[in-house]
């Protein structure tokens, strides 16, 4: 069986790592199974540094579609055309997609149009806000998928209510937990704790990945202020693990408030 695993962002690699390791193990045991890892972005994407793959103990992608643009509709079209070419030149039995990105939806559409079996990891996730682009992506991907892997009973119920056949839905739990279990013995105290003089369990980790929030600084500022007001200890350090535009937006907000003394922006570790 030839499996193609499609990822569209850094976080996707973390979710597919356990699957890649399971496929590799099955292959070593003599089973007729192999995989190709396809990244929809560029090879020089700064968010997927070598240390990411070292930490996850998986290889870098086998193929890069090279798509990089901010307009989601344009991105969708480019991924569709380039992924179609990939499938035409690489025999594939099953395509696995993860989460709810525009690139994920694009790959899902092409897969079904090519008559290839489609599996979706993190299926049945809903915000019930159809104005969110990702909610549209989720509905499309789940609607097209032949196999839906869900994280819990509530996700199963959503998939079933939306018409998914029972024999297509598999509750496999939160796949991120597999990574924690796999890496538990290798986990070390992050060097950044010592660098910033932090004590264990006495700091807050803050991250941000919603484009809608990044683009609405006024709303984001309200959320950050609400977070600080809700803290039991107003002096507790907040570690913001951010890069790129998200880091700049948060830095600008912090600079205009009284938070600089407690909020520290660092590169994702």
Residue ranges and their predicted role:
Residues 19-33, 229-234:
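A short, Lys/Arg-enriched amphipathic alpha-helix followed by its capping loop at the start of a domain
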Residues 4-7, 14-22, 28, 52, ...:
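Active-site and donor-binding regions of nucleotide-sugar-utilizing enzymes
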